[in-house]
From Swiss-Prot:
InterPro entries: Lipase_panc. Forms a 1:1 stoichiometric complex with (pro)colipase/CLPS. It comes from Felis catus (Cat). It is an enzyme of class 3 (hydrolase). This is Pancreatic triacylglycerol lipase. It catalyses: a triacylglycerol + H2O = a diacylglycerol + a fatty acid + H(+); 1,2,3-tributanoylglycerol + H2O = dibutanoylglycerol + butanoate + H(+); 1,2,3-tri-(9Z-octadecenoyl)-glycerol + H2O = di-(9Z)-octadecenoylglycerol + (9Z)-octadecenoate + H(+); all-trans-retinyl hexadecanoate + H2O = all-trans-retinol + hexadecanoate + H(+).
Length: 25
């Protein structure tokens, strides 16, 4: 599964940073 952001692009949700997906940058 991947998470996509308009400004950041797409990333795997198993990446180390996945925890920030639930927070604004």
């Amino acid at each position: 599964k991947e998470i996509c952001f308009p400004r950041l692009g797409c990333f795997s949700d198993d990446a180390p940073w996945a925890g920030i997906a639930q927070r604004p940058l």
